[in-house]
Amino acid sequence: MNIRKTSNLNKCLNLIVLILLLFNIIFLTSCNENGNTPLTPDYDYSLFPEEYEGLIKNKQVYFTSIGQSTDIDTFKILVLDNFVSFNYIFDKDITINEIQENSIVFVFVGCSVKALGESGTSIEDELNRTNNLINQLKTKNITMIGLHTGGQARRGSTSNQFIEKIFSNSSLNIFVESGNFDNMLTTLSVENNIKCYQIITVTELNNTIKLLNGVKE
């Protein structure tokens, strides 16, 4: 009699443990599916993805910005004006209608509310320009490269709106390490199966552009 009761008790305990394990598995799975616990794989993002070497060679290239920040101006002074020899179009306010088919567009993302105000552009206007660009990427076979080079200073609720849109729809994401302090930039890339490349300072974009143009030093 005692042996039978003990056996039944053990069965009940085993069943409870099994139910708890199943509950934990279901709970953790649902968290990952809903994006509540985004995970970034153990990967060295400071390594340039080799498959993108030569991506922009012999292509029409555009450099533009989303959010009206001055980060793209810094890039132009430090990199474009000194090291880039191929032809390109630099237009901070370019629209999708002005971008040729089968081209490459570098999009520097980061919001400056002050700059938006000075240019007479509202956040809604800039979001509309962003959406129009994204919606036509496939139609016009445009390759978009997302860049965030303003570091932590170009992060925040307003900037993040633009970052999420660009970094979720580009072909390659490039960013400075300080802007990824919370792993948002790598997480957006991983969740959308987009390769990304992490640099320390914007001056490293000199070599990055060379690699994209198929030039190795």
Predicted regions and their residues:
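N-terminal secretory signal peptides that target proteins for export/translocation
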Residues: M1-N10
